[in-house]
Amino acid sequence: MNAKGLDLSRYNGRGNWQKVKAAGISYVILKAGGVYSGAGDCYTDELLENHAAGARSVDLPFGLYWYFLPFTPVQTQADYFLALVDKYKPQLPIVVDVESSNGKNAKVTTSVLKALITRLQSPQKPVMIYTRQSYWDTNILSDPIWASCELWASRWSSGLTSPWSDGYFKFRDWTNWRFWQFSGDNNALAISYGFPGYPNGDPDIDLNWYNGTEADLYSWIGAAQPVLTLEERVARLEAAVFGH
């Protein structure tokens, strides 16, 4: 079975991390920060510290993502994000969330994104791109650098076995995916996965599949898979039987 994960930001509120793990979650991807759409200033997500501490408290590997907008100088975005990466030391590859051009054309957006990826990438820090096909193929120009990045695809559907298993929404620049965000809006599942829901957080929560099992995930990141306690195994079995 594919490993299930969450992606989280301040909108989700503060979680009950024992419940998160008991719900069958194998990893989380946390919003590190991003760029404001007005002046282009960088910011840190206000619950990053809380979410990172929570993931560590139950031995869940986590990643960090950066909300990209095509502002320059790129060095400012790169340095800000890398400082957070160095502070929190995520086990999963770092992610650039690409879903808005903030009014810029494809040439400008592509140029700034390519420059950011170039500054972020290193053998020790591979970069993954989060995006949806309908945005990417329209607003980002093709370039060989994208092939060096893993894909975290977004397409919300409960009836698919992969982001494009129905033959639609295939990406121009990727033929495979590493993560797939398959659910988000209007699922009302935040409470089921250990988060407060309305009014203390978003009632919905973003759900993701890893393209492989939990054992595959740990092998990919080069970490030992933790041994679940009897209570954790029972809780996961109940979550699987009664469904999320």
Feature annotation, model-predicted:
Residues 1-125:
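Substrate-binding cleft of extracellular glycoside hydrolase catalytic domains
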Residues 36-37, 71, 136, 160, ...:
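Flexible, glycine-rich phosphate/dinucleotide-binding loops
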Residues 77-81, 106-117, 137-144, 171-190:
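Short secondary-structure transition/capping segments
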Residues 68-73, 104, 133-137, 224-229:
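Noncatalytic linker/hinge segments flanking ATPase motor cores
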